[in-house]
Amino acid sequence: MEMGRRIHSELRNRAPSDVKELALDNSRSNEGKLEALTDEFEELEFLSKINGGLTSISDLPKLKLRKLELRVSGGLEVLAEKCPNLTHLYLSGNKIKDLSTIEPLKQLENLKSLDLFNCEVTNLNDYGENVFKLLLQLTYLDSCYWDHKEAPYSDIEDHVEGLDDEEEGEHEEEYDEDAQVVEDEEGEEEEEEGEEEDVSGGDEEDEEGYNDGEVDGEEDEEELGEEERGQKRK
């Protein structure tokens, strides 16, 4: 489908000014340019234009875009002028071979996240560290977090693994604490059961002693009776 027809289809009877997201992936671009996308899309915040033969974004209107997914061979200098509010830029699979191609992105002061997956530039030595040196405003590169004050790009994975280990350690401590609580509760229950057994055992002994006393008393009475009868016979 041609890009113009695709835009008309995505409008769904809405005015361009009411549209905040627009996905034009796989729509054909006549002469490799954007078409039918005008500054009437004044509230547009997300635009995706992947595949479809786009070779230039020189006719991109000025927009409030915050997120842009783009498959284009060059001309990124246009973005700083036309989309100054960009915070997320996805350029995966583009023919970007060196850092000079993305150097114009320095002008995007609000840019926080950049994706260059499957671009040749990612094969350069110290690729990540050099990108962050070039684009100081970035926080994420290829979905990896970066803190300019902490560690070099090469240590990001170790940093993330360390966070995972800390979380596991916290979970283990919580488990140990819970296990200790359970053990303490079980110990208290055993002590209570032991006390109950002692009490019941004591009661049983008292009852046995009482019964023995009754038997002895009866035997004594019988002996006294026999003695009295013997004396009377005499």
Curated annotation (Swiss-Prot):
GO molecular function, one term: histone binding
Claim: Repeat is one of the keywords in the record: yes
Organism: Homo sapiens (Human)
GO annotation, cellular component aspect: nucleus; perinuclear region of cytoplasm
LRR repeat coordinates: 44-63, 64-84, 85-107, 111-134
Regions of compositional bias (Acidic residues) in chain numbering: 163-226
Region span, Disordered: 161-234
Family the entry assigns: Belongs to the ANP32 family.
Lineage top rank: taxon: Eukaryota
Keywords: Leucine-rich repeat, Repeat
Gene Ontology biological process terms in this record: nucleocytoplasmic transport; regulation of apoptotic process
Upper lineage: Eukaryota, Metazoa, Chordata, Craniata, Vertebrata
PROSITE patterns associated with the record: LRR (PS51450)
Protein name: Putative uncharacterized protein ANP32CP
